[in-house]
Amino acid sequence: MSARAAWLVQAGCLDYAQVWAWQRQLQDNRRNNPDRPDVLLLLEHPAVYTLGRGSSLAHLKFDPQHPPAPVYRIERGGEVTHHAPGQLVGYPILNLRHHRCDLHWYLRQLEAVLILVLANYGLTGERIEGLTGVWVEGKKLAAIGIQVSRWISLHGFALNVCPDLAGFEAIVPCGISDRAVGSLVEFCPDVRLEVVRSQVAGAFAQTFELDLQPCSLEQLQAEENLTAIAGDP
């Protein structure tokens, strides 16, 4: 069987709220037309905190009325996390009916993608029983949080390549107080985010058996009739 075609959109550092709105539009489009191609968005965000749908404010070390960066409560599972430049974020908008209708399988597949990427650097990415994400030598390098509606996925994964980790000090990342957050640059000082982005795309295509076809952000906006949120330039 030939690999299913999907769109790969690689962008720079984009506003969180705008990308979140686009994700929801992409998900809606696939709920209405399940045969539309899968999409993988790879990008970065300015500093921001996101809370899962059931996240506890107890994991914030700052006053929510005066946050150090914007805070959003979103649809994904999991506790609070932090995004910042230098962290590669991946948002797969997949119709899992074309893959497997199994959320546990999907989470493990996302972990497998990141483990493959880390192997390029001679690092052994590890899973921890009962938790979601990927660790290297006890440090969490990748976080995962998803939402699925009618088997169309939303949100995804974040790999710390070379971000300023100071932003994580203002929270209990993912609600896990006894495990440190780390980044790829700590283990590989010469790592470059654009190289990692390409490696993530390759590992994703391999793991999900997809033919990822480059698609510019402008093409995606036109194909999917994506709209800007109020106040976006």
UniProtKB/Swiss-Prot annotation:
Pfam families: LplA-B_cat
Top-level taxon of the source organism: Bacteria
Residues given in the record as substrate binding sites: R76, G77, G78, E79, V80, T81, H82, H83, A143, I144, G145, G156, F157, A158
Gene Ontology terms, MF aspect: lipoyl(octanoyl) transferase activity
Any GO BP annotation: protein modification process
Catalytic activity line of the entry: octanoyl-[ACP] + L-lysyl-[protein] = N(6)-octanoyl-L-lysyl-[protein] + holo-[ACP] + H(+)
Pathway it works in: Protein modification; protein lipoylation via endogenous pathway; protein N(6)-(lipoyl)lysine from octanoyl-[acyl-carrier-protein]: step 1/2
Alphabetical list of InterPro entries matching this protein: aa-tRNA-synth_II/BPL/LPL, BPL_LPL_catalytic, Octanoyltransferase, Octanoyltransferase_CS
Key words, A-Z: Acyltransferase, Cytoplasm, Transferase
Annotated compartments: Cytoplasm
BPL/LPL catalytic domain ranges (all copies): 34-212
Segments forming a coiled coil: none
Record site: Lowers pKa of active site Cys: K140
Principal localisation: cytoplasm
EC number: 2.3.1.181
GO CC annotation, single: cytoplasm
Active site: C174
Extra remark: In the reaction, the free carboxyl group of octanoic acid is attached via an amide linkage to the epsilon-amino group of a specific lysine residue of lipoyl domains of lipoate-dependent enzymes.
Function recorded in the entry: Catalyzes the transfer of endogenously produced octanoic acid from octanoyl-acyl-carrier-protein onto the lipoyl domains of lipoate-dependent enzymes. Lipoyl-ACP can also act as a substrate although octanoyl-ACP is likely to be the physiological substrate.
Family stated for the protein in its record: Belongs to the LipB family.
Protein name stated in the entry: Octanoyltransferase
Organism: Synechococcus elongatus (strain ATCC 33912 / PCC 7942 / FACHB-805) (Anacystis nidulans R2)
